UniProtKB/Swiss-Prot annotation:
Pathway: Pyrimidine metabolism; UMP biosynthesis via de novo pathway; UMP from orotate: step 1/2. InterPro entries: OPRT (IPR023031), Or_phspho_trans_dom (IPR004467), PRibTrfase_dom (IPR000836), PRTase-like (IPR029057). Homodimer. GO terms for biological process: 'de novo' pyrimidine nucleobase biosynthetic process; 'de novo' UMP biosynthetic process; pyrimidine ribonucleoside biosynthetic process. The lineage of its organism: Bacteria, Pseudomonadati, Pseudomonadota, Gammaproteobacteria, Enterobacterales. Belongs to the purine/pyrimidine phosphoribosyltransferase family. PyrE subfamily. PROSITE patterns: PUR_PYR_PR_TRANSFER. SUPFAM superfamilies: PRTase-like. It is an enzyme of class 2 (transferase). It comes from the Bacteria. Its EC number is 2.4.2.10. This is Orotate phosphoribosyltransferase. Orotate binds at F34, F35, T128, R156.
Amino acid sequence: MKPYQRQFIEFALSKQVLKFGEFTLKSGRKSPYFFNAGLFNTGRDLALLGRFYAEALVDSGIEFDLLFGPAYKGIPIATTTAVALAEHHDRDLPYCFNRKEAKNHGEGGNLVGSPLQGRVMLVDDVITAGTAIRESMEIIQAQGALLAGVLISLDRQERGRGEISAIQEVERDYGCQVISIITLKELIAYLEEKPEMAEHLASVRAYREAYGV
């Protein structure tokens, strides 16, 4: 586990974005942990979040020209990641996001920011069913741009309805790499370092046995 990944887990725990217990997911599964990125909701939270996203992007080595944040949750993520790349990595890159409702006055259209072109890195909080990615792909392809990759905060590494995860489906369908700041693997490695969290470790491991990919 890299230092920024450990720091991200601690940041998520401190903000109660990451919680352990028993949670019922939309899929009906009972999960021993829950991740709600909406609780990163202050200026300082966003500044830190952008640094973690930027770190993961640089670490991945994937080449891209522009950041795209799908409405709505992807918008602040794309913005703060663009700021962090410029401030901490000397990479001043354009960013763009979509509107859910097309505008027919002013500048019009359903895209805001830089022109959507070149190799696009899509940033979002999580991928649950991959629906947001599919909608974004339509927008990206309509502009003649290419999807270079997708970056999310957490990869739960669990099966969807079939034998593979929603993330693996996205990789298969669009031929792109999906990367994340952390995966379930790092989460388990973190729990293994913390004797006081042993009760959670057992339940997370059992969940991975049942639903992991």
